[in-house]
């Protein structure tokens, strides 16, 4: 990536039509990326992916995807475990056919296991995922996401560690989830800087040139995330966050997950350009 691009989680709300029309509308809005939302189902066929690929290339839109919500790589139920792996693999297959760049997902829950045992289970599952993905795409990034609840696997350190130990894996950094997961921490300039410093320390400067970021407003409590909000209604200091991203010359994509996806995406893009 040569710069930091802004876009929407899914096709813009104001889109009239399908994913292809969503890509065209993202370009009309002056945004540069879009996340394919497979959160409830992988809803793009192989045939449709060819059309999505063509539209994204023509409009110069970078595509990412969010794999289904039903993933729990730490499930003791073997059927759910293997289904979770397949959700990620199949999301990557379709995203690859769409000429997508990155696949993010929530890896699972600690349940009754220790954090270390959960880590090892998730790591073993992800090894299987990467082995499969390499058969059809050796460049697409597989990205476990920082999660928003303390019951979920996915702290910053866990995600960095997976990225250190597995090929083709990098973090998806959700700053709203960091805020919610820590019940209000990581919301000042020094704290935002500490996140980027931790990533660079663990994964090198290249990691800051290759970031898949989620930003939204968020409501949270003691156990973490409750729901997403528009930025202006949230405690997240998104202005300071964008300032830090600009100062550090971070490159990659910022996907807006606020309820008003295109409005907040354009708000962030315009603010970022002013710094």
PLM feature spans:
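N-terminal pre-domain/capping segments
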Residues: 1-90
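Distinct, well-ordered alpha-helical segments
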Residues: 15-27, 45-46, 53, 114-134, ...
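Acidic (Asp/Glu)-rich catalytic clusters
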Residues: 23-30, 44-64, 90-99, 130-137, ...
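Acidic/histidine-rich catalytic cores of soluble enzymes
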Residues: 129-224
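C-terminal helical cap(s) of enzyme catalytic domains, especially alpha/beta-barrels
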Residues: 262-275
């Amino acid at each position: 990536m040569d710069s930091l691009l802004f876009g929407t989680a899914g096709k813009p709300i104001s889109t009239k039509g399908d994913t292809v029309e969503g890509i065209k509308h993202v370009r009309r809005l002056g945004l540069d990326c879009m996340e394919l939302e497979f959160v409830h189902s992988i809803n793009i066929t192989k045939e449709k992916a060819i059309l999505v690929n063509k539209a994204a290339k023509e409009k110069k839109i970078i595509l990412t995807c969010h794999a289904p919500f039903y993933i729990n790589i730490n499930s003791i139920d073997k059927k759910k475990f293997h289904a979770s792996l397949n959700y990620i693999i199949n999301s990557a297959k379709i995203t690859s056919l769409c000429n997508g760049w990155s696949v993010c997902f929530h890896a699972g829950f600690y349940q009754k296991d220790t954090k270390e045992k959960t880590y090892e289970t998730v790591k073993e599952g992800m090894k299987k995922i990467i082995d499969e993905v390499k058969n059809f795409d050796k460049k697409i990034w597989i990205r476990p996401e920082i999660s928003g609840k303390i019951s979920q696997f996915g702290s910053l350190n866990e995600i960095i560690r997976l990225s250190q130990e597995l090929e083709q894996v990098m973090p998806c950094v959700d700053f709203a989830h960091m805020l919610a997961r820590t019940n209000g921490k990581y919301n000042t300039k020094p704290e935002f800087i500490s996140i980027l410093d931790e990533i660079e320390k663990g994964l090198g400067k290249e990691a800051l040139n290759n970031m898949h970021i989620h930003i939204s407003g968020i409501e949270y409590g003691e156990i973490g995330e409750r729901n997403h909000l528009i930025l202006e209604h949230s405690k997240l200091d998104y202005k300071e966050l964008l300032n830090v991203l600009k100062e550090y010359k971070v490159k990659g994509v910022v996907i807006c997950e606020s309820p008003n996806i295109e409005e907040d995406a354009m708000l962030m893009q315009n603010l970022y350009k002013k710094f």
